[in-house]
Amino acid sequence: MAKLTKRQKAIREKVQAGKAYSVEEAVALLTELSAPVKFKESIDVSVNLGVDARKSDQVVRSSTVLPNGTGKTVRVAVFTQGANADKAKAAGADIVGMDDLAEEVKKGNLDFDVVIATPDAMRVVGQLGQILGPRGLMPNPKVGTVTADVEAAVNNAKAGQIRYRTDKNGIIHAPLGNVEFSAEHIKQNLEALIADLKKIKPSSAKGVYLKKVTLSSTMGPGLLIDQNSLAV
């Protein structure tokens, strides 16, 4: 049997199996147990939803602008033209174009984290589905990345908008910040996400909707969250 590392021992000693933690307790523990690595460990959430992800009408897919952002610098590419191109640039888009941008994508130049497109640009973007789709970059109106209001879309992306979709097990995965965030900021971000998830509950979903909420860090354990500690 392999020996436990110091960190694994610390996790085993400090994490109480089955305990539901408040967000403040969870963030304090994840920060205490964070690894001595050269990057800031992110703090992420997994939300188990009471949906049947095999049914198309119970797939939960949307976006949320986190009030305190994610702590990450987001590079935004926008497919548009004319006046909208000027608006996108003014809002802070990093790359703006149409056919020229599509050619760069086809060459493998994907130096961006979010792709936004105006409806008229989808004729161009549609050709890039096999490249953008597997990377989770394909614009979609359900998450606000196909829109005529490019200014708002760019602002939201830069402000820390997260996009999510239930996986095959009906679980949402999303970033909430990093170990340098205060517990209050993580809590506010989580509450914003939970509030949005409640708004988009599929009408056909039966029983308990928010089944389990778990916080974790990049290298750390998953901690069950006491939903009664959330103000939503």
Swiss-Prot record:
InterPro entries: Ribosom_uL1_bac-type, Ribosomal_uL1, Ribosomal_uL1-like, Ribosomal_uL1/biogenesis, Ribosomal_uL1_3-a/b-sand, Ribosomal_uL1_CS
Keyword rRNA-binding attributed: yes
SUPFAM superfamilies: Ribosomal protein L1 (SSF56808)
GO BP terms in the entry: regulation of translation; translation
Record family assignment: Belongs to the universal ribosomal protein uL1 family.
The keyword RNA-binding appears for this protein: yes
Protein name, entry field: Large ribosomal subunit protein uL1
Any one Pfam family match given in the protein's UniProt record, by short name: Ribosomal_L1
HAMAP family: Ribosomal_uL1_B
Gene it is expressed from: rplA
Regions crossing the membrane: none
Record text on subunit structure and interactions: Part of the 50S ribosomal subunit.
MF (Gene Ontology): rRNA binding; structural constituent of ribosome; tRNA binding
Role, per record: Binds directly to 23S rRNA. The L1 stalk is quite mobile in the ribosome, and is involved in E site tRNA release.
Source organism of the structure: Hahella chejuensis (strain KCTC 2396)
GO cellular component: cytosolic large ribosomal subunit
Signal peptide (from-to): none
Phylogenetic classification of the source organism: Bacteria, Pseudomonadati, Pseudomonadota, Gammaproteobacteria, Oceanospirillales
Matching PANTHER family: 54S RIBOSOMAL PROTEIN L1, MITOCHONDRIAL, LARGE RIBOSOMAL SUBUNIT PROTEIN UL1M
Keywords recorded for this protein, A-Z: Repressor, Ribonucleoprotein, Ribosomal protein, RNA-binding, rRNA-binding, Translation regulation, tRNA-binding
